[in-house]
UniProtKB/Swiss-Prot annotation:
UniProt-listed Pfam families: RnaseA (PF00074)
Assembly mode: Monomer. Interacts with and forms tight 1:1 complexes with RNH1. Dimerization of two such complexes may occur. Interaction with RNH1 inhibits this protein.
Summary of the function given for this chain in its UniProt record: Endonuclease that catalyzes the cleavage of RNA on the 3' side of pyrimidine nucleotides. Acts on single-stranded and double-stranded RNA.
Protein name: Ribonuclease pancreatic
Species of provenance: Hystrix cristata
Biological processes per GO annotation: defense response to Gram-positive bacterium
EC number of the protein: 4.6.1.18
Annotated coiled-coil segments of the chain: none
Catalysed reaction, written as an equation: an [RNA] containing cytidine + H2O = an [RNA]-3'-cytidine-3'-phosphate + a 5'-hydroxy-ribonucleotide-3'-[RNA]; an [RNA] containing uridine + H2O = an [RNA]-3'-uridine-3'-phosphate + a 5'-hydroxy-ribonucleotide-3'-[RNA]
Gene this protein is translated from: RNASE1
Disulphide bridges: 26-84, 40-95, 58-110, 65-72
Chain intervals for the UniProt region annotation (Disordered): 1-26
PANTHER family linked: RIBONUCLEASE, RIBONUCLEASE PANCREATIC
């Protein structure tokens, strides 16, 4: 069975680089990473940074998770991420996604030994 840590990597890690001008990035990646198998996952974030940098967030700023749990951590630095959101016209099994490329601080939930990210909680824009 897929561990929570492996699932996090499958759903959220794409260290190979950013999608640049490929408007099909979300459609391809959501399919390739098995997030459109039994439904169209409505929103998903891919992080374009080395896995070691994302794992390191577990030892950075401790914050509350959206669900009230206390094992979330916010990255000290901005990270290149891509938000994929299902479009209104999307109909399973033809899942279609819009894409936004952002530079934001990420919030992940961590657990286990080794202590690693198991859930992507949020991304935070530069505070104005």
């Amino acid at each position: 069975k897929e561990s929570s840590a492996m699932k996090f990597e499958r759903q959220h890690m794409d260290s190979s680089g950013s999608p640049s001008s490929n408007s099909n990035y979300c459609n391809e990646m959501m399919r390739r990473r098995n997030m459109t198998q039994d439904r169209c996952k409505p929103v998903n974030t891919f992080v374009h940074e080395p896995l070691a940098d994302v794992r390191a967030v577990c030892f950075q700023k401790n914050v509350a998770c959206k669900n009230g749990q206390t094992n979330c951590y916010q990255s000290n630095s901005l990270m290149h991420i891509t938000d994929c959101r299902v479009t209104g016209s999307s109909k399973y099994p033809d899942c279609s996604y819009g894409m936004s490329q952002l530079e934001r601080s990420i919030v992940v939930a961590c657990e286990g030994s080794p202590y690693v990210p198991v859930h992507f909680d949020a991304s935070v824009g530069p505070s104005t």
